[in-house]
Amino acid sequence: YSVLSSRQRMCPMNKSDTECRELIKARGGVRTATDCWHYNRHQRAVRTMSRFEENGQMGHYPAAWDMEDFDRVIEHEDACPFYTLRGMAEEASLIFCPYNYLFDINVRRRMGLNIDGAAVIIDEGHNLEDVCRDGSSAELSLDEIGKYADDLAKNHGKINEQTTVLSRFFQSMSNFLEEQFRMNSSPDATVVTSNQVKALTEDVLKDFPDHLPAILEIVEELTTTKSNLLTPITAPAVGLAGDIAVILMLVRTCSTAYNVIFGRNMDISGDTCPGIAFQCMQPAVAFHEVARDARSIILTSGTLSPMTTFEAELGVKF
């Protein structure tokens, strides 16, 4: 078994996601020879942890381990706990993780969690509705969109053609917002409700000729086989392009489940600024993405009442 947590909580060097990815780039094509000593030793820790089960089967000591055991192994091997646990998860039969690792579609995609045929057990299931709504929603400031469009457009190198496509993707959203703000000088936000969302989404993307799946293909290639070519400037932009493409695909296919809000005074990550938000109003959107692939989903809670309301929100009968 394994436990998944965020890089922010577990990195022994207190590095951000971008700084970490920069440090663990392979040197000379050798994946175990990176600039992060702890990352280079995480496979040693994975092998050490596997001995708990092996030795337990021979009766030497219990096969189960707790976090104190794990901490001792990490300290002894001087390894990265984040990548050690991810390595252990690849062969694990049981994985513990936060809600959003499953029900935030982009977190699940980035973590590479495969839930085909899995039994998913949700503790404190009464929180699931809000988690599902948040996991299928997105918000962007106009400044953020413009910055990433510029960062990707200025990239020069072997991936210039691909980053240019992503830059046009951001620019399409920027053009839409700027056009709306020119036509409407009101400080009040515009709320587009479910029956109008599909037409609005096409309007947002009208200046972008490429299909959204093509965006995901580019992002997947840039973050895997070509990750060494990304820089601390382009990496966050590429990651966000993938996240937004996924949300827009959901908006297109489940348009009646969404409201789209844009305005000059949006609350984006605690700041008041021009921006746009794609708000999922139906938890069933994220829940079905998991339920479709999982073998079963078991919810436990002392407060799942009334059940009829909960079933209606998640779009399934228990």
Residue ranges and their predicted role:
Residues 1-93, 103, 150, 157, ...:
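A substrate-engagement module of RecA-like helicase motors
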Residues 20-30, 163-166, 170-173, 245-251:
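Generic hydrophobic, helix-prone segments enriched in Leu/Val/Ile
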Residues 65, 75-94, 98-216, 302-316:
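Signature of the SF2 helicase/ATPase Hel1-core->accessory helical subdomain module
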Residues 70-92, 103-112, 215-318:
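A contiguous, basic/glycine-rich beta-loop/short-helix subdomain that forms a polymer-engagement track
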Residues 3, 121, 298-299:
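Structured core elements
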